[in-house]
């Protein structure tokens, strides 16, 4: 009873999650969006199954297909299966291909495994499914998966694949096998190399004419022997004896989801002879083959690897002004998981870069993780039917603006606060952008150093600042008063690197103000252009006013 209740809760949670991400579209727009994506996927299917070519990465195709199904669940009572390949398959399978249900995560897999025994895990080899029919010891027929009931006659093509056994004996002499035609790889590490569009490459080789030599780059992984020996060990032994050795080598007994997870992680990082996109867990006990039907296999499930790149919906386009006044564009996303990291925002770059990408809310973009786990945009894979892009702010900001607060300076002013609080400047631990926004909103700073005047009571009564952290924050602000002079100058945004500033040996504000352009130009990494920027900076009225204010606060190096 508890198990069924857990399953029911899981289903309800799944349904809730589906409806929670339904787009806020009118019926007319929903129909248009669904129709457009449906037509595109149909075109990809036609290219894939009729001509053996792919205009889209396998992972992108899978995720956009899932997105279409999600939209259909939101707006159509009965989602239609857009992928019914091949369109002209006419050969009946002796045993139907059931397909495999995907598990969302380890918990879902654990629930499924709980009521089952004699379970085995295999790699989910990434290729094209096939039926192999042996009669009287010879390969009699090879049929593409098609729609699960009918497929293409691939006998002639498969007979040219040297890795596929053309003759067998013993129990296999009159058998029907199901498996995956795959692209042979030498030491393929899925974690490092990804999917390499293997499925599309296999389909292309099988569909094209006159490519008999290249077919030898293919092989087959047998994953099912309908009506075969009852014991999995006997099944594996007979297949290996016949020459289908991969099945025995890559099939392991498992008792629980933890064991599956260990094997899954092992194969994710190991050198394998094929591309994989997850694992399949199957029960050794199967119904008679006459009961097999597409979409109705209860004895096996798949747990796919998390894609290296995820398709994410753009929810909003936002503009940020950095401390130097440059405007950057950020895409706010419907959350996706990448390598155990929840990604909700991705930096697009400059306004010009955003315009080149042509990204609007409602578009679907491909996101991956670059170095140090930073999200990046790889591609725009689908653009919505209705596209409204926001207008970027006027480019009125520069490195000498917004040291003092104003309505138009909000974003650059906050960026300056975030910068001066960073480890490499004043090292104000425990406060980031959200904290600075809370302080400024409550206490209405006049300039970027106004926080020095805050009292413990003011900090404690600031909404958004935890009372338990307010004393620590006040302590950090007080410690900042003792930071070296060069750190304060960096906080003021002097256009020099730390190395150049240290080499200048400037130790007071008055000394810095009297230094000439020639003096700055001789510093390491500082040319004439940078030297002129320093002169413009120190002669700026806002900078002079800040210097006088810091002198009044008796900050080291600024005293008269």
Curated annotation (Swiss-Prot):
It catalyses: NAD(+) + (deoxyribonucleotide)n-3'-hydroxyl + 5'-phospho-(deoxyribonucleotide)m = (deoxyribonucleotide)n+m + AMP + beta-nicotinamide D-nucleotide. Keywords: DNA damage, DNA repair, DNA replication, Ligase, NAD. Pfam families: DNA_ligase_aden (PF01653), DNA_ligase_OB (PF03120). Its EC number is 6.5.1.2. The keyword DNA damage applies. GO terms for molecular function: DNA ligase (NAD+) activity. The active site is at residue 124. HAMAP family: DNA_ligase_B. Belongs to the NAD-dependent DNA ligase family. LigB subfamily. Catalyzes the formation of phosphodiester linkages between 5'-phosphoryl and 3'-hydroxyl groups in double-stranded DNA using NAD as a coenzyme and as the energy source for the reaction. This is DNA ligase B. It comes from Shigella flexneri. The lineage of its organism: Bacteria, Pseudomonadati, Pseudomonadota, Gammaproteobacteria, Enterobacterales.
């Amino acid at each position: 009873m508890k198990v069924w209740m857990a399953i029911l809760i899981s289903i309800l949670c799944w349904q809730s999650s589906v409806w929670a991400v339904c787009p806020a579209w009118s019926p007319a727009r929903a129909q248009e969006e669904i129709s457009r994506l449906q037509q595109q996927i149909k075109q990809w299917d036609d290219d894939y199954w009729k001509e053996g070519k792919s205009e889209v990465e396998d992972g992108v195709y899978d995720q956009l297909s899932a997105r279409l199904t999600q939209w259909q669940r939101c707006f159509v009572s009965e989602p239609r299966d857009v992928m019914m390949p091949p369109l002209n398959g006419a050969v009946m399978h002796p045993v139907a291909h059931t397909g495999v249900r995907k598990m969302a995560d380890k918990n879902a897999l654990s629930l499924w495994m709980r009521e089952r025994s004699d379970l085995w895990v295999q790699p989910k080899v990434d290729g094209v499914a096939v039926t192999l029919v042996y009669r009287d010891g010879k390969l009699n027929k090879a049929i593409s998966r098609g729609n699960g009931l009918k497929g293409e006659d691939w006998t002639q093509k498969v007979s040219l694949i040297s890795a596929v056994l053309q003759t067998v004996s013993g129990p296999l002499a009159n058998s029907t096998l199901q498996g995956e035609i795959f692209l042979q790889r030498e030491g393929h590490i899925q974690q490092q190399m990804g999917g390499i569009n293997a499925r599309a490459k296999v389909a292309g080789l099988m569909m094209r004419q006159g490519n008999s030599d290249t077919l030898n780059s293919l092989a087959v992984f047998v994953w099912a022997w309908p009506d075969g020996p009852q014991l999995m060990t006997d099944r594996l032994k007979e297949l290996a004896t016949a020459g289908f050795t991969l099945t025995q080598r890559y099939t392991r007994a498992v008792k629980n989801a933890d064991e599956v997870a260990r094997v899954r992680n092992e194969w994710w990082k190991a050198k394998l002879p094929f591309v994989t996109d997850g694992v399949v867990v199957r029960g050794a006990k199967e119904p008679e083959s006459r009961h097999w039907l597409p979409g109705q296999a209860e004895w096996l499930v798949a747990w796919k690897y998390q894609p290296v790149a995820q398709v994410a919906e753009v929810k909003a386009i936002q503009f940020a002004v950095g401390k130097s006044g440059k405007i950057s564009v950020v895409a706010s996303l419907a959350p996706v998981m990448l390598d155990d990291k929840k990604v909700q925002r991705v930096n697009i770059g400059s306004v010009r870069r955003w315009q080149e990408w042509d990204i609007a809310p409602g578009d679907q973009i491909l996101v991956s993780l670059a170095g140090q786990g930073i999200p990046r945009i790889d591609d725009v894979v689908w653009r919505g039917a209705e596209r409204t892009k926001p207008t970027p702010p006027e480019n009125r900001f520069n490195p000498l603006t917004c040291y003092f607060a104003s309505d138009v300076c909000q974003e650059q002013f906050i960026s300056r606060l975030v910068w001066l609080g960073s480890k490499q400047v004043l090292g104000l631990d425990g406060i980031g952008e959200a904290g600075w926004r809370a302080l400024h909103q409550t206490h209405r700073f006049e300039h970027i150093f106004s926080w020095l005047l805050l009292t413990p009571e003011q900090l404690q009564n600031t909404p958004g600042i935890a009372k338990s952290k307010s004393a620590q924050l006040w302590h950090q602000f007080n410690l900042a008063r003792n930071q070296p002079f060069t750190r304060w100058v960096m906080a003021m945004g002097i256009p020099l690197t730390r190395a150049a500033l240290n080499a200048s040996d400037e130790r007071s504000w008055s000394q810095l103000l009297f230094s000439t352009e020639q003096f700055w130009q001789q510093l390491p990494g500082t040319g004439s252009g940078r030297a002129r920027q320093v002169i413009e900076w120190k002669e700026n009225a806002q900078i002079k006013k800040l210097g006088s204010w810091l002198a009044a606060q008796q900050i080291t190096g600024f005293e008269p």
